[in-house]
């Protein structure tokens, strides 16, 4: 059910960090209410790219995405970047009106840069504001390092896992740092 207070969480896995030369290889979304309760999980999409594109990944991405099985899923996928964008927007339209939710996640500006370059319609679906959990992590590192250090992430570098961790991390900071 559409609600303008719902929050859209997104995570992308990419072949690297430069949106001009790297591409999105996996994406996932979760919609929560304003209290961070999960309402729905969107499609988890491995986006097809050629072996030539995948061969340009650096050592870290090659190792990480190979070990997680993502590289193989990308090779086997039949979903294009445009199809992934359309599927994701169709899911989001059920839960949040266009332009209402900030883009939510960890280091979300990086994801937004890739969306702006490769999936402009999806990037435009979000409000211009960002809800970046990394901001609280950086503040906690300076003002309450024990709070930051008490949250442990799994670091699977799979999009859906990363979103779930981002939501859990924000809950952690809400309880132990902001203390609401």
Curated annotation (Swiss-Prot):
InterPro entries: Exonuclease_RNaseT/DNA_pol3 (IPR013520), Oligoribonuclease (IPR022894), RNaseH-like_sf (IPR012337), RNaseH_sf (IPR036397). Residues 7-170 form the Exonuclease domain. Keywords: Cytoplasm, Exonuclease, Hydrolase, Nuclease. It comes from the Bacteria. Its EC number is 3.1.15.-. It is an enzyme of class 3 (hydrolase). The keyword Nucleotide-binding does not apply. The active site is at 128. GO terms for cellular component: cytoplasm. One of its GO terms (molecular function) is 3'-5'-RNA exonuclease activity. It is found in: Cytoplasm. Its main location: cytoplasm. Pfam families: RNase_T. GO terms for biological process: DNA metabolic process. SUPFAM superfamilies: Ribonuclease H-like. PANTHER family: OLIGORIBONUCLEASE, MITOCHONDRIAL. Belongs to the oligoribonuclease family. 3'-to-5' exoribonuclease specific for small oligoribonucleotides. This is Oligoribonuclease. It comes from Pseudomonas putida (strain ATCC 47054 / DSM 6125 / CFBP 8728 / NCIMB 11950 / KT2440). The gene is orn.
């Amino acid at each position: 059910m559409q609600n303008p207070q719902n929050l859209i969480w997104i995570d992308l896995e990419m072949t690297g960090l430069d949106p001009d030369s790297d591409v999105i290889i996996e994406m996932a979304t979760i919609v929560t209410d304003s209290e961070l309760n999960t309402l729905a999980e969107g499609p988890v999409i491995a986006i097809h790219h050629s072996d030539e594109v995948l061969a340009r990944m650096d050592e870290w991405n090659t190792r990480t995405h190979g070990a997680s099985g993502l590289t193989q899923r990308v090779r086997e996928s039949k979903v294009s970047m445009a199809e992934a964008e359309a599927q994701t927007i169709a899911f989001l339209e059920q839960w949040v009106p266009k332009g209402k939710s900030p883009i939510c996640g960890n280091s979300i500006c990086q994801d937004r840069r890739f969306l702006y370059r490769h999936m402009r319609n999806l990037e435009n679906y979000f409000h211009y504001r960002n809800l970046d959990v990394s901001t609280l992590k950086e503040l906690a590192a300076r003002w309450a390092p024990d709070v930051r250090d008490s949250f442990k992430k799994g670091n699977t570098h799979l999009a859906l896992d990363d979103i779930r961790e981002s939501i859990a991390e924000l809950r952690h900071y809400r309880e132990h740092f902001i203390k609401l």
